[in-house]
Amino acid sequence: QWKLKDKKFSYNYRGRGINKYSEMIKYIFARKGLFSLPAASIIAFLKTQENLETPNIQIQYIPFSVGSLKKRVFHDFPGMAAACYQLRPNSTGSIHICSPSPYDQPSIKFNFLDNDIDRTTLIDAVKIMRNIVEAKPMDLIRDFEHSPGNSISTDKEIEQYIRETAETGFHTSGTCRMGPGSNAVVDDKLRVHGIKGLR
């Protein structure tokens, strides 16, 4: 996230305090104002490595910044943020049932950043996002990097920041292996191995 030099470049002022209510009224009655605007005003699909055939990351620049990723309350200064998504992650997770009861929650392990390629890709993506915002033309609007801040600069520090702040994006999905082996979940007739009568 970055602090900006002028409030006209950020949604923060319009999304705080009493202003957010006037923006809500504008939207309800005229379909205008803050709530009619996209969350991400700039989106780019980029390659983190030149030798790749197609882009492997999506970057979004967002014209607001928040004090807490959990509460999502706009900062009291003009700000912007950036987010990145790895388009084809290599890490794989797992889901396991914990009991015969359909009411018991399954055990889900996402295993985010379990693969070296994923870690390198996201570290490179953070560097690309920073380079774009730190470019000379951005001097007109950018003040300074608010978070994680310039103190986070090595690959190890960036990876730790990613681990502490990353969230899932879009829709988590997956599949399971079919076959007779011990790594397969279902057989060729979609019957779940080890559980009689479950398809």
Show which residues each predicted segment covers.
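A general boundary/transition motif marking the beginning of the first structured unit of a protein
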Residues: 13, 32, 85, 117, ...
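Mid-to-C-terminal "cap/lid" subdomains and adjacent gly/pro-rich loops that border
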Residues: 1-76, 133-136, 153-156, 160, ...
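Short, glycine/acidic-rich hinge or "gate" loops at secondary-structure transitions
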Residues: 139-151
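C-terminal structured subdomain/cap of oxidoreductase catalytic cores
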Residues: 1-9, 46-49, 79-138, 159-199
